[in-house]
C-alpha cells in the first residue's frame, strides 16, 4: 500500500487530554482545502482509520481547522498512527489523502522538553511521536508504569544534570558500552566481542568496557562471570554512562540502547543524536535490504561499520553510502568461537 503524500499546515495547537487528541491548524486557501481528517494506522497491508470531528473558520484567505478525536471510542491497536487529511490541492474537487505535516519547531521543542501523553481506559497510552520529520504522528501502545511516569522524566533530567555538572570527569572515563537487541540479549556478536575484550584487553582498557543488559533476562547468565563490567539497563548509573560513553557498540540500531518506543524527552533526543556507533551487525547485509534504515546521514548512521568480506564492504559502500574508511573487514566476532569438527575422512 503506497504511503500518502504530505500537506504542510501552520500549527496552532496540539493537545492530549483524557484520551482526546485535539489539533488546531491553518491552511491558506490557495494551497488547498481539507474536507476531512482521520487517524490512520501505519500498516502496509491493513487500511484502518478513524475519523476526527472537525470544524472550520475563515480568517481572510486562510482557513482555520479545529479537529478532535477520542481514541477510547475506537478499537485502536498498538501501532504508529498518522493524521491524514482528505485534501483538494487544486480546487477542482479532486480529493486525495495526505499526511498532515508542519508540526512547528516551537511545538516540537515543547513536546520534547515537556513530554505529554494521555492514558486510555483500557490500559494503553497515546502520545505524539517526535522525530526528524515534522508530521503529526501518534503512537498507541500499552502503558508501562515503570517508565511512563513523570517520576521517570525527573530521573532523566537528574541523570543529565549529574552528567553535565561533572562532564570532564565522566568524559575522562572514555567508556565503551556494548549491547544487543533491546538490551535483553547476549548471544550474538555483541556477546563475543565483549568476551574477547574481557579475556584479552589490558586491565586499564577492560575497566572502561561495559556490557548493558537487563539482569532479569535469561541471557544475563552468559555475561554474569564478568559482572563487574556488566551494567543494569536503565539504572541511574547507566543513564549517566550512556550520556558519557565515547563509543556505543551494538549489533542493532542506537534505539536499542534505551527504552523501546519511549515517549519524547530531552534525554532521548540528546542520546539518539550521537554518531559514535560501532555497528557489529548480525551478518545478514548480503541478502537483507537494510539500506533505508542504516544509510549514512540517516537517524541510524554509524561511525564504523563491521563487515565480513570485501563483497559485503562493497554493498555498504554502494547502497548505504559509507566511505571505505568507515567500513572495516574483520569478520564477525561470533566466528571466533566456531570449532572445526569436520572429519577429514569425509
Describe each model-derived feature in a short phrase.
Residues 26, 47, 58-64, 175-339:
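Active-site and donor-binding regions of nucleotide-sugar-utilizing enzymes
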Residues 1-175, 199:
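Basic, ligand-binding patches in group-transfer machinery
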Residues 340-346:
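A short helix/loop element that forms part of the nucleotide-sugar donor recognition site in Leloir-type
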Amino acid at each position: 500500500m503506497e504511503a500518502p503524500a504530505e500537506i504542510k499546515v501552520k500549527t496552532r495547537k496540539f493537545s492530549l487530554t483524557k484520551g482526546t487528541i485535539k489539533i488546531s491548524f491553518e491552511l491558506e486557501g490557495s494551497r488547498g482545502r481539507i474536507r476531512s481528517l482521520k487517524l490512520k494506522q501505519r500498516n502496509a497491508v491493513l487500511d484502518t482509520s478513524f475519523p476526527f470531528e472537525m470544524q472550520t473558520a475563515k480568517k481572510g484567505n486562510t482557513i482555520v481547522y479545529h479537529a478532535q478525536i477520542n481514541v477510547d471510542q475506537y478499537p485502536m491497536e498498538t501501532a504508529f498512527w498518522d493524521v491524514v487529511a482528505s485534501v483538494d490541492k487544486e480546487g477542482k474537487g479532486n480529493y486525495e489523502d495526505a499526511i498532515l505535516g508542519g508540526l512547528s519547531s516551537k511545538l516540537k521543542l515543547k513536546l520534547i522538553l515537556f513530554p505529554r501523553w494521555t492514558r486510555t481506559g483500557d490500559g494503553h497510552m497515546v502520545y505524539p511521536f517526535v522525530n526528524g520529520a515534522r508530521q503529526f504522528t501518534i503512537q498507541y501502545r500499552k502503558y508501562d508504569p515503570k517508565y511512563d511516569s513523570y517520576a521517570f522524566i525527573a530521573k532523566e533530567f537528574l541523570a543529565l544534570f549529574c552528567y553535565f555538572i561533572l562532564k570532564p570527569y565522566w568524559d575522562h572515563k572514555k567508556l565503551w558500552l556494548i549491547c544487543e537487541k533491546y538490551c535483553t540479549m547476549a548471544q550474538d556478536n555483541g556477546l563475543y566481542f565483549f568476551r574477547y575484550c574481557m579475556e584479552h584487553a589490558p586491565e586499564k582498557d577492560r575497566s572502561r568496557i561495559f556490557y548493558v543488559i537487563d539482569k532479569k533476562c535469561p541471557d544475563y547468565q552468559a555475561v554474569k562471570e564478568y559482572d563487574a563490567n556488566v551494567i543494569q539497563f536503565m539504572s541511574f548509573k547507566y543513564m549517566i554512562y550512556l550520556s558519557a560513553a565515547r563509543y556505543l557498540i551494538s549489533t542493532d540500531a542506537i534505539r536499542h540502547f534505551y527504552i523501546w518506543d519511549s515517549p519524547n524527552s530531552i534525554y532521548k533526543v540528546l542520546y539518539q543524536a550521537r554518531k559514535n556507533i560501532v555497528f557489529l551487525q548480525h551478518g545478514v547485509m548480503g541478502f537483507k535490504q537494510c539500506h533505508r534504515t542504516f544509510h549514512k546521514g540517516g537517524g541510524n548512521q554509524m561511525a564504523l561499520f563491521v563487515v565480513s568480506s570485501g563483497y559485503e564492504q562493497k554493498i555498504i559502500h554502494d547502497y548505504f553510502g559509507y566511505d571505505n574508511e568507515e567500513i572495516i573487514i574483520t569478520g564477525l566476532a561470533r566466528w571466533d568461537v566456531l570449532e572445526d569438527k569436520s572429519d577429514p575422512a569425509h
